[in-house]
Curated annotation (Swiss-Prot):
Gene: folD
Annotated protein name in UniProt: Bifunctional protein FolD
InterPro entries, per the entry: Aminoacid_DH-like_N_sf, NAD(P)-bd_dom_sf, THF_DH/CycHdrlase, THF_DH/CycHdrlase_cat_dom, THF_DH/CycHdrlase_CS, THF_DH/CycHdrlase_NAD-bd_dom
Pathway connected to this protein: One-carbon metabolism; tetrahydrofolate interconversion
Pfam families, per database record: THF_DHG_CYH (PF00763), THF_DHG_CYH_C (PF02882)
Entry binding sites for NADP(+): G166, R167, S168, S191, I232
Native organism taxonomy: Bacteria, Pseudomonadati, Pseudomonadota, Alphaproteobacteria, Hyphomicrobiales
Reported function: Catalyzes the oxidation of 5,10-methylenetetrahydrofolate to 5,10-methenyltetrahydrofolate and then the hydrolysis of 5,10-methenyltetrahydrofolate to 10-formyltetrahydrofolate.
Keywords: Amino-acid biosynthesis, Histidine biosynthesis, Hydrolase, Methionine biosynthesis, Multifunctional enzyme, NADP, One-carbon metabolism, Oxidoreductase, Purine biosynthesis
HAMAP family: THF_DHG_CYH
GO CC annotation terms, alphabetical: cytosol
EC number: 1.5.1.5, 3.5.4.9
């Protein structure tokens, strides 16, 4: 068996196009231009690249993009004051503070200061609590992207056995809640789980999100399983550059699984696309409009 590759580039491009269509519609029908504000603290190169990508894709979708770059030594009260101004700005419907923050800044305090209605990262305790309760909420972008990728293979996840390897607040825990909302049967595993390979072999859906390169081997997988690889590890290559490696041994998985996301070109492509989805949804909710068709 050779698995099919779940092409995150193609699926993300389609999602961005649908977002752009809906943005044009709400502009035309309601005079609403969704706006996303991104706050970058410091000059981490990886974060700078990610923020530039967000800015470019936000504008391409027809949304307003607002960038705020602060020095790494910014005082926490000053950062909180910026968040308060963005909360009050009617042109801003989504606020994202790029993580991780430099030392000396309390991430929980900053995230909790964001208006939950504008929390397009889905990390505010209000949104996390609603998601855990099975209520409508802005969901973290990477887990949301994982669900969309999975549903490109399976129209319904109802009754399927899923395993999520990783229990972070950013990916693992919210992904479990989204899978439960799809009526999947979910096991959450982590670094202290016993018999992890055996647990994986039972699963129709495998989500690897631990950040340990090639941890999930081919013989861990149930034949025909769908494998969503969230992990990213940078490994030195022979040419002196670095290459990205996922949490799944890709070549081995391709011989056993039914469908696999590559790294790069899989989940990462979906994260910014889902950020646009959340911004559009937030804008419509804030303005009291019906939920958009994405």
């Amino acid at each position: 068996m050779t698995a099919s590759i779940i092409d995150g580039k193609v699926i993300a491009a389609d999602l961005r196009a649908r977002v752009a269509f809906e943005v044009a519609r709400v502009k035309r029908d309601h005079g609403l231009t969704p706006g996303l504000a991104v706050v970058l603290v410091g000059s981490d190169p990886a974060s700078e690249v990610y923020v530039r990508s967000k800015h470019k894709q936000t504008q391409a979708a027809g949304m307003a993009s607002f960038e705020h770059v602060l020095p790494a030594d910014v005082a926490q009260p000053d950062l909180l004051a910026l968040v308060a101004r963005l909360n009050a700005d009617p042109a801003v419907h989504g606020i994202l503070v790029q993580l991780p923050l430099p030392k000396g800044l309390d991430t929980e305090t900053i995230v909790a200061a964001i208006d939950p209605a504008k929390d397009v990262d889905g990390l505010h305790p209000h949104n996390a609590g609603r998601l855990a309760g099975g209520l409508p909420a802005l969901s973290p972008c990477t887990p949301l992207g994982c669900i969309i990728l999975t549903k490109s293979v399976h129209s319904s996840l109802e009754g399927m056995d899923a395993i999520v390897i990783g229990r972070s607040n950013l990916v693992g825990r919210p992904l479990v809640q989204l899978l439960l909302n799809e009526n999947a049967t979910v096991t959450i595993a982590h670094s202290r789980s016993r018999n992890l390979p055996e647990l994986c072999r039972r699963a129709d859906l495998v989500y690897a999100a631990v950040g340990k390169a090639e941890m999930v081997r081919g013989d861990w997988l149930k034949p025909g399983a769908t494998v969503i690889d969230v992990g990213i590890t940078r490994r030195p290559a022979a040419d002196g550059k670095t290459r990205l490696i996922g949490d799944v041994a890709f070549d081995e998985a391709m011989e056993v699984a039914g469908a696999v996301t590559p790294v790069p070109g899989g989940v990462g492509q979906m994260t910014v696309a889902c950020l646009l989805v959340n911004t559009l949804r937030a804008a419509c909710a804030i303005k009291g409009l019906p939920a958009p068709g994405v």
